[in-house]
Swiss-Prot record:
Record's protein name: Queuine tRNA-ribosyltransferase
Enzyme Commission number(s) of this protein: 2.4.2.29
Subunit structure: Homodimer. Within each dimer, one monomer is responsible for RNA recognition and catalysis, while the other monomer binds to the replacement base PreQ1.
Gene: tgt
Protein family per UniProt: Belongs to the queuine tRNA-ribosyltransferase family.
Amino acid sequence: MKLKFELKKKNGNARRGQLIFERGTVQTPAFMPVGTYGTVKGMTPEEVKETGAQILLGNTFHLWLRPGQEVMKMHGDLHDFMNWQGPILTDSGGFQVFSLGDIRKITEEGVHFRNPVNGDKIFMDAEKSMEIQKDLGSDIVMIFDECTPYPATHDEAKKSMEMSLRWAKRSRDHFDKLENPNNLFGIVQGGVYEDLRDVSVKGLTEIGFDGYAVGGLAVGEPKEDMHRVLEHTCPQLPEDKPRYLMGVGKPEDLVEGVRRGIDMFDCVMPTRNARNGHLFVTGGVIKIRNAAHKTDTTPLDLHCDCYTCKNYSKSYLHHLDRCNEILGARLNTIHNLRYYQRLMESIRKAIDEDRFDQFVAEFYARRNREVPPLQKDKA
């Protein structure tokens, strides 16, 4: 089913809306937990939903390698395979291919690489990505693109962006040929170069997509460059389509993305950091394995309503972490996922109440940090 995007309110550049799918409605701005292999690590779908998650991200590349398209089709699709009946967005595999480094070769046709699981030679292109994502039953399908690395010269970024545009057209054509009833998002590339981002936006909007992602950021560039590119790119994207910042990020990155007009985010950070004992709280980050928490009987965050904070102390979580108990990783993950969803809920409420700038100021004040200036404020 084609999603319906309703833009309900704006507060500066911050946007408040909703994505309406057959499988449910997603309030935006929204954060999507990452379920790489068809699971948010260590969590049942019910637990993920209880944290406030409305939509998940699945990984086309990894699910293609394991368990494969045939096993997926035996179950119906990814929703049935993992028992998550809400909306799912799948990335196209482009970023994972980018991450393979020396074991892949990119050509105009697609990408030749060795299967990191068993070493077999395999090939992925725009058409194959569209076919896999249709079999996954993705509510939002991402085009196959090349993630421009950082650093890249202007010429390198230009060639990469232009190839991604050609792949975008192939993705659109094959998506339509497959008669996929769901939704296809384009991905803006161009590295840190504003003129290349302009060309990418123009090319993608001429092809036409159901939503637009900003890709190729959070790959090593300075934060100032990410903010500058977002601030330049977002106003050029169609007002009536959702905007998705891929692979981002820290809580501060989500706030800065919303300040610049982003509606959707995803990142492994809350789950990965949870497993490493880095826990997000109102004032910043707690490293739970530090000795200072051994005798601290207070919860992680007095403002948090998650299962972990309602039932366990920092001392207990420290103990579980030091003993490498699986429960520790699970409780940490529940907390971090809930923190991210509470952050998005607070952002949505602030936009609804026309006080988003005040929210941003308070968010940074709790971290003893200055609010990063917008480009227009620097002029």
